Each structure stands twice: as C-alpha cells, then as structure tokens.
Amino acid sequence: MVVLDSVSTLRESIQKWRKAGLTIGFVPTMGNLHAGHLSLVKQARQKSDKVIVSIFVNPLQFGPDEDYDRYPRTFEADKALLQQHNADAVFCPSVDEMYPNGQAQTRVIAPEKMTSILEGAKRPGHFDGVTTVVAKLFNMVQPDIAILGQKDFQQFAVLQQMVEDLALSVELIRAPIVRDETGLALSSRNQYLTEIQRSVAPKLFVALQSIEMAIRSGNKNYSSLCQIATQQVLSDGFDAVDYIQVLNASSLEEPQQGDQALVIVAAAKLGQTRLLDNVLVSL
C-alpha cells in the first residue's frame, strides 16, 4: 500500500493504473476508521482492481462551534487497518494541499431544497463543505466507483444529486449501515459516549424500527408515528431529538401517495454527542 500526501503523487499512481487498464474504487473518509468504514473498503475491493481511501478531516464542513479541533485523528492506526484490508493507496493531504487558496477557494453549492432540511437546518453551510471537498476528491482520483455509507443518508442523496448535475463520470454505491451487537450504528463519534450513554444509544434504532413496522402494517400517519417515536426516545434517556422524519428516499421530500421507497431519518443528542441513524423502507 502506498501513502500519498500530494495531488501530484496521487495522479502519478492513477496514471500508471489507468495505462494498465485497471478500474479504480474510491472510499472518501475523515479517518478514525471503524468496521463501518472497512466494510466500504471491502466492497470497493470486490468491485474494482485498485482501491484508494482518502483520509482528510475537512474544515469546510465544520461550523464554528463544532468538533473540528477535537475530531479524532488516528492516522497510524488507520493506515494499519487499511493495509490489513488490502487498500492499494491512502491519500492523506494536508489542509494546505487540498485548499491552497484557503477560504477564498471556489465552492460547490448543493441544491438548497436538499440542504436546508435535517442536517442542513442544524448545520448551515455543512453540505457546501461536503460537496466542495468530494467534488475536488472525485476530480483528483477520477474513480470508476465511490463507496459511501448509508448512515449519512442525506449526504449520499446530496452527493448523488451533485454527480448527476455536474455530469461526473463516477458511479456512487450506497453501502448498508454497519451496527454493533446492540444495534447502534457505528460512528467515529460513538467514542465520545459514556458507558451509561452507550447503553441508551441503541434505543434510537429501536424507535425507528417501530416506525418501520407500523408503516409496513399500513399506517401512513407519518407525522403521528414520528411524534410518538420522539417521545419514546426522550423517555428512554436522550437529551434532545433534532428530528425524526419519514421522507421519500430519493428526493428527501415529504412522501406522496404511491411512493415505493421511503427512509426514516433521525438525529438525537446524548450529552454533547449527536447520533444519526436511518432505516430504509421499500413498499
């Protein structure tokens, strides 16, 4: 596995692989890798000849009061895991390498109808930071496929829209959420949880499953289902619920009669830690 920290060395490797007619799979991450990330690497390995993983904690997607400075950076451990999982290259640029013009650089602005809701409502500017860095990474890596996790559901939908709108020649693949034995969705931020909070955390998924079962039983009063689930999560010990909603899985809009693919999305806080989760429902 090669470690690349500049755009020029990245492009040299890619050029060699392209000349040999090899396909490239790409997994963009912010590091602090866990089994969820590694499942993406495994899928990329199965679907492509060469696998590149990027590790870059992107300052553009963090707000002023968010956890950019304390976001876990575990590069040596990450590198060892990627080697074990047969990645071919890890791209780990500095902030200056990614953004030589600093804050003055060109931005990619995501569609407001998809970014003014859910995470976007809580984190203004977050998705413009995501689309900017991912568009730039796609341009640098030029992958055939990119594997992204389902846990950040809104992010996947926004990036899929970006790929379509900008006619980028990459296929996005959404990989299922990886959960621990309690049902908690794996996340780099789970390590912030205390032992007591960790025992409460899986109850968010339980609440989403109860909505799913009700929908499958024919209940279409989504607003009422989400209100009941919100009260349940709060009584289970969560400190706040930012949202629990049922949406069209493609457009992220309110479900319409006849929609076949729905997603139940949620964000809730335990102490200072925000947990995201979602459940897909195919009707």
Swiss-Prot record:
The keyword Nucleotide-binding applies. It is an enzyme of class 6 (ligase). It catalyses: (R)-pantoate + beta-alanine + ATP = (R)-pantothenate + AMP + diphosphate + H(+). The reaction proceeds by a bi uni uni bi ping pong mechanism. ATP binds at residues 30-37, 149-152, 178, 186-189. Keywords: ATP-binding, Cytoplasm, Ligase, Nucleotide-binding, Pantothenate biosynthesis. Belongs to the pantothenate synthetase family. Homodimer. The keyword Ligase applies. This is Pantothenate synthetase. It is found in: Cytoplasm. Its EC number is 6.3.2.1. GO terms for cellular component: cytosol. CDD domains: PanC.
